[in-house]
Amino acid sequence: MNRKVTAIALAAIIWATAAQGFLMFKQGRCLCIGPGMKAVKMAEIEKASVIYPSNGCDKVEVIVTMKAHKRQRCLDPRSKQARLIMQAIEKKNFLRRQNM
């Protein structure tokens, strides 16, 4: 009897853990933790992207991929460099829409 109760309790804990992880995954989350860096060397940036607020994250995130080791870094969206990157991406997207 004791083994049966233990097995049921263990199964319930495993199910609850899996269900909780699934719900967190569906909700999404921010990619950047903390305020982010003020600036990085422009020559070391391979790619930049801006992620606007959504249901999963309520803040603007500026993420740059570095040439060395393909590491990603988060920039503070209020920093001068991040604002310049966001303007450049918006201009590029605007021009792309104009050419369609």
Swiss-Prot record:
Interacts with TNFAIP6 (via Link domain). This is C-X-C motif chemokine 11. It holds the Pfam family IL8. It is found in: Secreted. InterPro entries: Chemokine_b/g/d (IPR039809), Chemokine_CXC (IPR001089), Chemokine_CXC_CS (IPR018048), Chemokine_IL8-like_dom (IPR001811), CXC_Chemokine_domain (IPR033899), Interleukin_8-like_sf (IPR036048). One of its GO terms (cellular component) is extracellular space. Residues 1-21 form the signal peptide. GO terms for molecular function: chemokine activity; CXCR3 chemokine receptor binding. One of its GO terms (biological process) is regulation of cell population proliferation. Its main location: secreted. Belongs to the intercrine alpha (chemokine CxC) family. Disulfide bonds join C30-C57, C32-C74. Keywords: Chemotaxis, Cytokine, Disulfide bond, Inflammatory response, Secreted, Signal. SMART domains: SCY. Gene3D superfamilies: 2.40.50.40. Chemotactic for interleukin-activated T-cells but not unstimulated T-cells, neutrophils or monocytes. Induces calcium release in activated T-cells. Binds to CXCR3. May play an important role in CNS diseases which involve T-cell recruitment. May play a role in skin immune responses. The keyword Disulfide bond applies.
